[in-house]
Amino acid sequence: MEELLSPKELSRLLKVSKPWPYIMVKRGLLPCYKMGKVIRFKRCDVEEFLERSRVERRG
């Protein structure tokens, strides 16, 4: 089974604010898994999100 991250772990890993994971889920940009009131993120989904969000540098 793949590693699941809590919103707190994800925000620490990516060095973003604590609400950021919830905002991305609400916008439909980051998939999550709900187990009752608890949400978790698959590491591979986070990596795919980061690849899609990548900005190519021009210059």
Where are the language model's segments positioned?
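Polyanion-binding surface elements
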Residues: 1-20
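Helix-turn-helix/winged-helix DNA-binding modules
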Residues: 2-3, 27, 38
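Residue-level detection of the helix-turn-helix DNA-binding "recognition helix"
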Residues: 26-27, 51
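Short, solvent-exposed alpha-helical "recognition" segments
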Residues: 27-33
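Short Lys/Arg-enriched helix C-cap and helix-to-coil transition segments
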Residues: 33-39
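A short, Lys/Arg-enriched interface patch at domain edges and termini
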Residues: 44-59
